[in-house]
Amino acid sequence: MAKLEITLKRSVIGRPEDQRITVRTLGLKKTNQTVVHEDNAAIRGMINKVSHLVSVKEL
């Protein structure tokens, strides 16, 4: 399977709690932090929910 490189580009300050939880579940804590996840439906759903806060690159 492909891997996705997910980077938190915008802060979660002032964002709804569900978006904060989604960002934390992806493993992101700080702005400009990058994590790598397998490309699957669950991860894609989380990315879609916070797409305005993160950038995604396929590896």
Curated annotation (Swiss-Prot):
GO MF term (any one): structural constituent of ribosome
InterPro entries: Ribo_uL30_ferredoxin-like_sf, Ribosomal_uL30_bac-type, Ribosomal_uL30_CS, Ribosomal_uL30_ferredoxin-like
Matches recorded under Gene3D superfamilies: Ribosomal protein L30, ferredoxin-like fold domain
Keyword Cytoplasm: no
Any single Pfam family the record assigns to this protein: Ribosomal_L30
Key words of the record: Ribonucleoprotein, Ribosomal protein
GO BP: translation
Superkingdom assignment: Bacteria
Alphabetized PROSITE patterns for the sequence: RIBOSOMAL_L30
A single cellular component GO annotation: cytosolic large ribosomal subunit
SUPFAM superfamilies the UniProt entry points to: Ribosomal protein L30p/L7e
The keyword Ribonucleoprotein appears for this protein: yes
PANTHER family reported for this sequence: LARGE RIBOSOMAL SUBUNIT PROTEIN UL30M, MITOCHONDRIAL RIBOSOMAL PROTEIN L30
Family: Belongs to the universal ribosomal protein uL30 family.
Oligomer status and interactors: Part of the 50S ribosomal subunit.
Protein name (Swiss-Prot/TrEMBL): Large ribosomal subunit protein uL30
Organism: Bacillus licheniformis (strain ATCC 14580 / DSM 13 / JCM 2505 / CCUG 7422 / NBRC 12200 / NCIMB 9375 / NCTC 10341 / NRRL NRS-1264 / Gibson 46)
Gene name in the database record: rpmD
